[in-house]
């Protein structure tokens, strides 16, 4: 029986396999002993962007790849995904050692930067379009990379994290053995103090810091919601931004988007009643990175800042400019240094402005 010519030709055509998550064993110096996985779509953009996606404690690159679908949009927009995988301290990333917190100091942060350099070199990726995101430990690492390697990353989106250097000296990264004062929201500094930590991570750096987007649930019992306020204080001080106003029920009902400046450099999301794992809205993250929108747009708040009277605080202490001064669960200074007043962003966070 003769085989139809069309079937013969079809059999001879090359089979195009779907892209998949692939481990890279030799990406360069790896002081953090991390594993590297990448997703490279079959059709890359010209000078593709890079997104580094970092898992929570106890997780892995493969698990985080399956949790949030960044790979389907990668097929459409042609960007490359890097999934680092931690191997120590209950698979938590090192956000506590001076090595990881310091530019070119070593440990996990340098391993991740070397992964980025490998992808830029191997695939011709755009070094000006390197982004990062993560949940819990991955969100903490997003803050670490923003402080230690601001010249590598253009933007970041952190879900349930804490400020840069909040875990400094904790002794370990895992949630069981490490010092719990930061995760319980007990470490509170002024914006200037938090900013000093960042500047110490990369002495002499005078360039721009990554655009940052922070997400946190008000019912988080693993990493205190108070840490969102400290993140806000740290990065708005670094960027010199003031609170502009809120957008309620954005992007979901019960979520409040807190806008700083014109909204193009820093924004924070408060998720009412949400616990430790704030669901990741991939479309919002990609828009923030400028991958789907093509540019970073400014936003106009639907509410304006509410100025509240600064009450006297215990011990007569005063909060400095940019510092937190109120909110549910907050126990620090509630009076602001003159001439600033305590302005309410939402029920959980007020700031001296």
Curated annotation (Swiss-Prot):
**Region (Catalytic) location:** 19-291
The UniProt activity regulation field reads: Inhibited by the specific serine esterase inhibitor AEBSF.
One GO term under biological process is: pectin catabolic process
Glycosylation: residue positions: 179, 246
Q: What class of enzyme is it?
A: hydrolase
Q: Which GO terms describe its cellular component?
A: extracellular region
Q: What's this protein's name?
A: Feruloyl esterase B
| Gene field | FAEB
